[in-house]
């Protein structure tokens, strides 16, 4: 099995050369180089300065002081090889994380859509409130104006009430007595005349005398009542003026109330709209709360899955931190610490490699991709030309199951136009299909509500969540379509009823016209002789025969029309439009006018004579007896 290592170079220490030290450059120098150096030193020198034995001075043969800069020593590099642990992603866990991220993004988008809807409703609500404020101020002004006018009219009404109470008191006081002295005198005089000029019994005369005495007793009351009435009559002008003022103020109040009512109607409409918007905002707020809860739950699932991924790659993260620390120590030339860190890491890796089979399998999985990319075999050898690449076992992610779109309710018109299915389903099969569909719908709804959690390998993918706002819009469009179709049906029914009513009215008018014609014929025929009646009967018979001849060809299209109506409208009961048979009335023999006019005149004359006799005995005889 191959092992992947990472080399770390420690910065070498600088080599400093002093005068007392042995120059390594001079020790390693070859003789040829020394000879050349000696010749170079002796070249151009004065022979007089040489020693007697011809040897040069050792100090003159030493290298110059800047030799270290011209010929620097090769820098020594320390290399330490650490074991590298690569990142490995679990395909199942990666698929779950991707699905959880998609679900989380969908929840965020759904919440943002609800936010936008709430924002739009808030703007609409703000517009309605801005319209309500001036209307409320105007309504307040109208209320103040009405209250001021009511305050102004209150004392006038009190004054009129006082007049009314006084008038009622005077009327109650003068009830049963004469209204004035003149009327009292006339009543007394009439009774006296009756006593003196008429022949009446004694009891009647006593009764009349008693009435005269009672009238005389009421004279003081009549005088006081007439005086009070005179006083009230003096206040009539003032009362009329007050009534005029009350009328003018009342008209002003009525005008202000009409304007206020118009403003209040506008305010009521806006308040109803505001209440509807508040209700919609409340429902949207509930949807937002639910969306926030779903988003938080999806985020928790995603965080848990990410923690699981981090726990699965904990060895990779630890190795990454160790390598970063080693690079940091190497950059600071801390050789001992790098060496100690290297030894500790390698010893630990070897111990785990020898003791744990799971560690070996995990490390092998992690390094396979690196070996494959470097064209190496499993044991780290160079791959032979005929050797196949290393097969990395990875489970392919299952393709996402496409969720079937929600079938919205079709309008009635489209449902009628849609063709019927070819295969007919029996009632038993239909009930079985419905029974299977109910648990599947419940399961899909539970899966849609639950957020992404740790799934078993056999768990089915969850269907996509449907947007709430989109569903509401679809339902609203369906309701509008239903209302439109209902209105069309009502219009058609109203048109049919109107047509039937018009036909019925036309038939009634024709019947009435026929009745009038028959009555006119009866009246005209009553004065004719028997000869004329016979001629009329003949003419009626001829007219009837002609009508029957005319109705015979017309009956054919009528029957055809009835057949067509029966053929195309099965459920509609058609009425026959064939003309009804004409009724022939036999005329009675006319009676003579003088046969009943003479007796009637005699009876009337007898009644007039009887009434004249009764009037004479009732009126004229008593008057003559009294005179």
From Swiss-Prot:
Q: Which residues, if any, are the signal sequence?
A: none
Q: Which domain of life is it from?
A: Eukaryota
The membrane-topology field of this record reads: Single-pass membrane protein
Ranges annotated as biased composition (Basic and acidic residues):
28-40, 455-498, 505-519
Q: Where are the transmembrane segments?
A: 596-616
Where are the stretches annotated Disordered? 28-70, 394-572
What the record says about the induction of its expression is:
Induced by brassinolide.
Q: Briefly state the protein's biological role.
A: May regulate plasma membrane ATPase activity.
Protein name stated in the entry: Proton pump-interactor BIP103
User: Per the UniProt entry, what species is this protein from, by scientific name?
Assistant: Oryza sativa subsp. japonica (Rice)
Upper classification of the source organism reads:
Eukaryota, Viridiplantae, Streptophyta, Embryophyta, Tracheophyta
